[in-house]
Amino acid sequence: MSENIDDIKNEDSKKIKIIKLRKKVVKIVTHNDLNGKNNSNSSINLDKHNNKVEYSQNRDNRAGGYSQNRDNRTGGYSQNRDNRTGGYSQNRDNRTGGYSQNRDNRTGGYSQNRDNRTGGYSQNRDNRTGGYSQNRDNRTGGYSQNRDNRTGGYSQNRDNRTGGYSQNRDNRTGGYSQNRDNRTGGYSQNRDSFPSQYQVSTKKTYVGKNTSQNKYTTTPMSFRRVIKAKVPSIVSSASSVDSENIKELNRKLGEKKKQQQESQKSYKRKKAETESKTIEQKVFEQLQKKKRENLANPIPKSIDIMGSITVSDLARKMNLKSSDLIAKLMALGVMVTINEKIDSDTATILVEEYGSKVNVVSIYDETFIEEEVEDQSKRIEKPPVITIMGHVDHGKTKLLSVLQNIDINQTESGGITQHIGAYTIVYNGREITFLDTPGHEAFTMMRSRGAQVTDIVVLVVSAIDGVMPQTIEAINHAKEANVPIIVAINKIDLPDSNPDKVKHQLSEYDLVPEDWGGDTIFVLISALKNIGISELLDMILLQSDMMLLKANPSKRAIGKVLDAKIDLGRGIVCSVIIEDGTLYIGDSFVGGVCYGKVKALISDKGVSVKSVGPAKAISVLGFSSMPQAGDPFQVTKTEKEAKLISSKRQDLKKYESSKNVKKVTMLNLYDSIKEGALKELKIILKADVQGSVEALKNSLEKLTNDEVRVRVVHSSAGVITETDISFASASDAIVIGFHVRPTSKAQILADQEKVEIRKYNVIYDAISDVKSVLEGMLEPDVEQQFIGFAEVRAVINVPKVGVIAGCYVSRGIIKRDAITNVMRDGLQIHSGKISSLKRFKDDVKEVAEQYECGIMIDNYANIKEGDIIEAFEVKKIKKTFKT
């Protein structure tokens, strides 16, 4: 009884302290906005029944601290039920409690036992284990109290919700603040997505006393005491305020949504306007650009064309697009493609549509360079240009060696001349330029060019061999060029020499010696023994004096390309003979269809010079591309003029090529089919100089007959490159290099692509090897040679095998796989091949005369007794190549 009295006293002292705290008036801060659904404050909790307000979270308008109150119960650390005053102990049914709680007038200690329940610090209900926290309905407890099998920590969880310091409801995340309905919390409690600060207030109010007892409670992280206060009058009208706030909120949301829609429409409208302006700007810029282009490249007032022109070329001349011309032609009813040609009449109509005119001209007139008006008073004597011609091995090059005191043959493979050479010597104070031409039949064009650029031809004829085919050819070249001939009969030092025989042979070609009453100069020489050389030079100077050779060194240079090659260190190097005028470094020129500007001039001695005059041979560096040997060389006023002339000549070349295109007609259809049946040996030809390329190409293309032919798919001067190997691999061709070798990379690529490269230094070897390859491509001749015959004495029909003829070899031999003719009554009734030959049951290769055997003929069963089987052996005879 005394213990109960002490407990009551302690409880009373606690109540007195709480009453003192209540006397301190505090300001309560309330939130301006209310939750439309829960009707609860976010910063304060209102206890409707007991008029208590706390910072903790309230359910059903209950005041709370760390403990949660249910059903209008005041809470501290302990939880109160049914208006019960609580401390550390909990009271039930309006019972006063201390550390121990009494139920149903039962005495309690530290542990309270209910209905034979074990107690400790925690109070157990209905056979439940307790700790500091009170468990209900077989629930595990900690500091927090769990309901309905919920795990608890400091926070109290409802309906299987995870808790922290804050209490979560309806799967809401909590921190120090308590969240409701997916609301974010801070130190204050948020309701219905309303923003929270530490305190949000719309109205200040004083809090009065309350009869209910409370303990100290603190709001998390704020460390403020919870004070009971009277509920202000504003709470009574919460429902109406909530309704108005909801309407106001909906109205604001509607206005905001409407503003967003209008803003989005405005953005789309502005974007469309911007895009439209951008498109218009682009179109305008394109029109301006086209206008500027037209101003920069206006349509010419007149254009020059030949008989026909392609649409692309016409568009280029008119500074228009090909598509524009094609569209215009379509409007005129003419359907063409970009590379299709139109005649001059159609071109005239089309050009007139654009306000221009057409001048139909001959392109030949445009390819000529207008020469200077020559002042005859400036013409002076020039050195003679002498071309040495004759048959191979008649001593032409040896003669030049004597004239220059050098051994030229050491520089030529095989001891024969395969390049045209130019040398200048001085004799009796006068210069003489010599051109050495090859004597081999393959170098006909070189000899022809030599005759065209020369002043005098020295025809070298062997006193032993006499007149040979190339001798006659040289005579014809000289006569065509209208060039005088001096005959040098060489090798007179040999015992078998017969100069008179040579004179007699040459007289048949209108070359009659002066001592025979003719006008042709004959000189007997021996280049080996240096006999008659001075006399020959004297005759050359005499002949040139009689011809009155003159030139004007002050005019622009005119000459001819003798040869061209590619030097690895210098590029394209061309040997040019200057016929008139003087060539300087820096001059612009045209050589054939090529143009260029002189970068360097190198003499025959290998010395760089600044200029070269008439009748001199010089090596020129500066060609834009490789010219052809024999092309005319001419200096122009400007580089622009040189480019224009070069372009015109290229057009002429294309025009002539287009005219030479062979069209298939009914008349030549058979020839085309026959030509397609020919076997071709495709060759890619590379040589050191352009003249050698030309000579070797002409010689190889002559190797043609009814079955095979050579086709040079590509030829040029220079080393064998990777491009040549790739071309050969694609076209299934072999590569022939004449005096050139492949680069290291080209050789590696050739090994990878299995491309055959053949290298030659002598033209004879190249032609001979190609002939051998062509012979291998020829189909061999097939001949049937009689080897024997056999008489059929029995016919045996073997099931699943066939008909076997039992034979007796009456003459010669019978071989397996031999060709047979089956003869009956003197007539051939079948021709076939022996598929099986046996002696008794053994397979044999052949059966000799007077032996019996079994013969089965392939795919033939109509054999009878008395038939004669003739056997033949097929032999293939290799053909020899004949042109």
From Swiss-Prot:
Predominant location category: cytoplasm
Organism of derivation: Borrelia garinii subsp. bavariensis (strain ATCC BAA-2496 / DSM 23469 / PBi) (Borreliella bavariensis)
Compositional bias annotation for Polar residues: 32-45, 75-216
Gene: infB
Region (G4): 490-493
Name of the protein in question: Translation initiation factor IF-2
Start and end residues of each stretch annotated as G1: 390-397
Composition bias type Basic and acidic residues, residue spans: 46-62, 251-260
GO CC, any one term: cytosol
Keywords, ordered alphabetically: Cytoplasm, GTP-binding, Initiation factor, Nucleotide-binding, Protein biosynthesis
Domain tr-type G positions: 381-554
Region listing for G3, in residue ranges: 436-439
Compartmental location: Cytoplasm
